[in-house]
Amino acid sequence: SKIKPELNEPDFLGESRECQRVLSYPEAVREALDQALGLDPRVFVMGQGVDDPAGMFGSTLNLHKKSGPGRVFDTPLAETALMGVAAGAAMGGMRPVYFHNRPDFLFLTMDQLVNHASKWSYMFGGEVNVPLVVWACIGRGWGSAAQHSQALQGIFMHVPGLKLVMPSTCYDAKGLLLSAIAD
């Protein structure tokens, strides 16, 4: 039997409800990023492959063309440094969205993320905020091997100062991403 979602959104079999659009998960993420970039000039998107012709599996498709290469840009393979760049930009008043396409390599960012970004608000009595969104894709296909397919949310959910969301529907993905960027 078909399972119909409770929320007013398309079901999982691609059938839309009357007067509803059908969006894929990557399309929902892309729409959220596009809206956030359009609403707030402090928002920028960085990460490996965000300006790729495939657009991070469609999640960032052509956003670099629409918003410009200064607001949506590719980064080198240097996770530790880039988390520091994102955290520093956030402390400086920007609203970075760091696309980290392999959660396994978030371990390389632990010092910047866990010892600094997540704790600065506590360390400075709420005077310093780090409005940083880290987007990590889990379970994006077969053949990812042991170091490219871990689900590490259990570790991150225990870090004070981090807010962890795991949207399971397109509707939630768009809404939670917009909320996280605005928070």
Task: Show where each model-derived region lies.
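Thiamine diphosphate
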Residues: K2-D183
